[in-house]
């Protein structure tokens, strides 16, 4: 494969990886959103402390809007993230209209509450039970949380990327473009050199005299010398 074509493929691959829909490899894409599980235990005073773990990354606590999304989160939680049995959902109980709402302000169009859940209170939070996929109600007053599931819509807001990330991405792209151009130049010089080589090594022109004629001329010269 020509150097230029190979370099172009490398450039395309790197550009795709850098500018993928999700911020980085720790995020997982599903439908129109990206998800990441922050595997750290933090001490908290209220749910806002947990939520800050996500908002610091330009995201929010997870919201779930259909059965497919719930199943995806459950499957990824079990197989990839290895999260806790009870995962805090990004919802709160609004006493003004006596209903649960999502922190990310999306509509509450789906729920999966377990049948035995009881009365809703002002300090009631929602949890995803990882063994069954059902939602449970629990007290928002907690001292610590093991793992936080964050969600953000695509496209990810680039302002939350660090300066180092942007710098590295720029350097990678610039280096790849340079390699692509260099590869194209090398390939061009190689092709030109190959064409010149065919001309340089073309067969030498034949003498107008055959070997026999040359031998006769040589013998005549020798005979003349002997007469002298």
Curated annotation (Swiss-Prot):
Topological domain ranges for the Extracellular compartment: 21-165
GO molecular function, one term: signaling receptor activity
The keyword Nucleotide-binding is assigned to this record: no
GO cellular component, one term: filopodium
BP GO terms, sorted: phagocytosis
Residue intervals on the Cytoplasmic side: 187-228
Location (main, coarse): membrane
Pfam families the record matches: Lectin_C
Positions bearing carbohydrate: 107
S-S bridge residues: 125-140
SUPFAM superfamilies per the UniProt record, alphabetical: C-type lectin-like
Domain C-type lectin residues, every copy: 30-149
InterPro entries: C-type_lectin-like, C-type_lectin-like/link_sf, C-type_lectin/snaclec_domain, CTDL_fold
Signal sequence range: 1-20
Keyword annotations of the record: Cell projection, Cytoplasm, Disulfide bond, Glycoprotein, Lectin, Membrane, Receptor, Signal, Transmembrane, Transmembrane helix
Membrane topology label: Single-pass type I membrane protein
Subcellular location, record wording: Membrane; Cell projection, Filopodium; Cytoplasm, Cell cortex; Cell projection, Microvillus
Residue spans crossing the bilayer: 166-186
PROSITE patterns reported for this sequence: C_TYPE_LECTIN_2
Superkingdom of this protein's organism: Eukaryota
Record's function text: Potential multifunctional C-type lectin receptor that may play roles in endocytosis and phagocytosis as well as in cell adhesion and migration.
Protein name: CD302 antigen
